[in-house]
């Protein structure tokens, strides 16, 4: 019995090697799991559920096959795929999670999230996030022709790359006090998230001497990064792209 967690694959037609590894993972590993959690940034950028491309259908097909074979799949939106919506969920069978979700892992209560909201020192990003998550703005964006949305997204991606070059690694990492605050909010001793691309298992001792665990998922840029969680053990492993 085990549950799988992945995040930050940044799937794109530009990186067929990552796509191939993802498909292999879905068909050979995810199919054997009790459940699969995708904690954001599955896509390098998801323009909208109306994406007509062969690439988008290819990815949706993998999820559809997995869920139709009885493996529950849960999806947390990241900062690159926050436009994943109900249509995507209906077409794939995945269950969309809120930004912060409490789950039961073999008797262990845990909070799962993408992780971007933990980076409270990155105020410019959080301001941007607040704007693009406004429902009216997302509805307006959804009404635009797909080709125009592609152009706007390319501009946004360029701005994001430029902005990251001027930020320190500390600003783009989580704020420890925010991590503790979220864990206290949900009364949990385990947190699992992605976003920072710094895979690790951290032990945290709080002021009341409670020992908590924060598991950070890795990205898939150079190799597949997967967390296998069972009742006895949490194991990170990486696999080279085929």
From Swiss-Prot:
EC number: 3.6.1.54
Reaction catalyzed: UDP-2-N,3-O-bis[(3R)-3-hydroxytetradecanoyl]-alpha-D-glucosamine + H2O = 2-N,3-O-bis[(3R)-3-hydroxytetradecanoyl]-alpha-D-glucosaminyl 1-phosphate + UMP + 2 H(+)
Pathway assigned to this chain's UniProt record: Glycolipid biosynthesis; lipid IV(A) biosynthesis; lipid IV(A) from (3R)-3-hydroxytetradecanoyl-[acyl-carrier-protein] and UDP-N-acetyl-alpha-D-glucosamine: step 4/6
Chain positions recorded as substrate binding sites: 79-80, 122, 164, 167, 195
Pfam families linked to this entry: Metallophos
Keywords in alphabetical order: Cell inner membrane, Cell membrane, Hydrolase, Lipid A biosynthesis, Lipid biosynthesis, Lipid metabolism, Manganese, Membrane, Metal-binding
Note accompanying the cofactor annotation: Binds 2 Mn(2+) ions per subunit in a binuclear metal center.
Keyword Cell inner membrane: yes
GO MF annotation terms: manganese ion binding; UDP-2,3-diacylglucosamine hydrolase activity
Record family assignment: Belongs to the LpxH family.
Annotated protein name in UniProt: UDP-2,3-diacylglucosamine hydrolase
Species of provenance: Vibrio cholerae serotype O1 (strain ATCC 39315 / El Tor Inaba N16961)
Species classification: Bacteria, Pseudomonadati, Pseudomonadota, Gammaproteobacteria, Vibrionales
